[in-house]
Amino acid sequence: MEKKIIFLVVLVALLALPEFISSEVIKRDIPYKKRKFPYKSECLKACAAAFTGGDESRIQEGKPGFFKCTCYYTTG
């Protein structure tokens, strides 16, 4: 019984591994001219519009900066 559980855990880990390998996180800066220090939600929306066609689920993080947003998003 223990061998079956260990086998299932290893199998699930191996099946999930390509998902982590195939998605690459990209970091890019975009200008944001509406506000000196934009809110994080504004950065997420701006990053999604600029790089993923509006798909906010692919945006990992949007960090506000001085008249810019630093975007972290995945490909694929």
Swiss-Prot record:
Reported modifications of this chain: Contains 2 disulfide bonds.
Coiled coil: none
Signal peptide: 1-23
Subcellular location: Secreted
Official protein name in the record: Omega-scoloptoxin(15)-Ssd3c
Function, as annotated: Voltage-gated calcium channel inhibitor (Cav) (8.6% block at 10 nM), when tested on DRG neurons.
Family: Belongs to the scoloptoxin-15 family.
Domain notes: Has the structural arrangement of an alpha-helix connected to a beta-sheet by disulfide bonds (CSalpha/beta). Since the toxin contains only 2 disulfide bonds, it is called 2ds-CSalpha/beta.
GO annotation, cellular component aspect: extracellular region
Record-annotated membrane-spanning stretches: none
Keywords: Calcium channel impairing toxin, Disulfide bond, Ion channel impairing toxin, Secreted, Signal, Toxin, Voltage-gated calcium channel impairing toxin
Tissue expression per record: Expressed by the venom gland.
Main location: secreted
MF (Gene Ontology): calcium channel regulator activity; toxin activity
